[in-house]
């Protein structure tokens, strides 16, 4: 999926490929996917604090990267909102829980999809061609490889 986002990003003017991967409380799936693919510019995970706006924020970093390379690829774990430094930037305003008692997060991928484009237009007058990919259920439907099977057996 990251390769698809990369292909979409490089084939568009000011292209941005945004991929949301599983990872509510841990970003190891997003991290490992980024490490195995050399085309990712930014990886957002719940464990590492980050800002969206401001001079050191994600939005400015994306603009800078697009200005340099003409494209950018971002991978975000679904629970990355937990890493936001500024509580006012949180997208989940009301705490909700599912039947099992797990927190329900608002969709950070959809949120970023809209906000990055708006930010680039309003602050830099830069139109961005953003392609958003959410392969969550496709990942669950694939048979595990040998390493995953061994790890699961050890954890069990």
Regions of interest found by a model, annotated:
Residues 1-128:
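Accessory alpha-helical/coil subdomains and C-terminal extensions
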Residues 123-156:
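C-terminal active-site/capping subdomain that shapes the small-molecule cofactor and substrate pocket
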């Amino acid at each position: 999926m990251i390769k698809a986002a990369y292909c979409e990003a490089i084939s568009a003017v000011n292209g941005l490929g945004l991929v949301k991967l599983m990872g509510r409380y841990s970003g190891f799936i997003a991290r490992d996917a980024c490490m195995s693919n050399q085309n990712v510019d930014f990886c957002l995970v719940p464990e590492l604090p980050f800002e969206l706006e401001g001079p050191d924020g994600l939005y400015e970093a994306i603009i800078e990267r697009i200005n340099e390379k003409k494209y950018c690829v971002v991978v975000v774990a679904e629970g990355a909102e937990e890493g936001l430094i500024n509580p006012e930037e949180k997208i989940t305003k009301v705490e909700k829980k599912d039947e099992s008692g797990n927190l329900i997060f608002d969709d950070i991928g959809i949120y970023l999809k809209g906000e990055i484009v708006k930010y680039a237009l309003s602050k830099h007058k830069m139109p961005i061609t953003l392609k958003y990919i959410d392969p969550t259920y496709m990942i669950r439907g694939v048979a595990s490889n040998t390493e995953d099977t061994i790890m699961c057996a050890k954890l069990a």
